């Protein structure tokens, strides 16, 4: 197979129908037709995601053999984070995390304070036996910014925020006391209050856990020496882990995050009391318990959104297609070649292959 770039098309209107018309014209100029398409893929994390889904549907309606396949060049993690951000509280978490990272890393002096605080805490933890030594361990002394490109790592940002939580709190405390102006001090104080809230810490741990499950898969899909069979196995494992987390993981997750609350004296609400949504008026709010809100509206809801996205990107058909394609891999003298897979592959394109 040889890939060729055939052009860039300017579109004044980005509706699905307009995009479809633009593609039709581009293909027509090159003597090609949508009827000959055998696959399609898009950037699922962009702000055009809805339009691309509509475009995909239009093309499949005209040509059901133009199967959708996840674009491996685009990082799956960014797509899953984009999906999570459709949930208001997940979006608030990422927004607040970005603000904290920007404020704490706004100057070399603040970065130095953060580094010194974290190094001191690492030494203290090593002495107490709370953490152990080892190559590559305990080396994080700076916060990572979550990039908007495919190379960005939201998982690294969330993980470091948890690892360095105490040091970040210390830096914000310093800014509250010694900020150069009232605006800086006020901003740091607001971030500090938000950071030490139950809602933030709960959402931080939840998203770190969920993104952590999909992180290995996201990285595997981008490797140049991609092993499709291994990648599809990771997709299956990833779905299973998320489903297990949803079905049986609430108690262990809440116990884990409760330990973190205790360490930083963060008040845990009574889960049987009525949830108070500070973002909406009491007239519009439904009377639900804290347990229902955090378990059903956050824990279950965000996991379900991730599972739905994975199922949409890697459904039974395109997963089987990718596994069939893997048998054509020339590596190791076509070690993966499988005649039965090749026959199965041909069945997806009956117009191109005669009956066997």
Regions found by a protein language model. Give the residues of each.
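Alpha-helical structural modules in large enzymes and assemblies
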Residues: 1-356
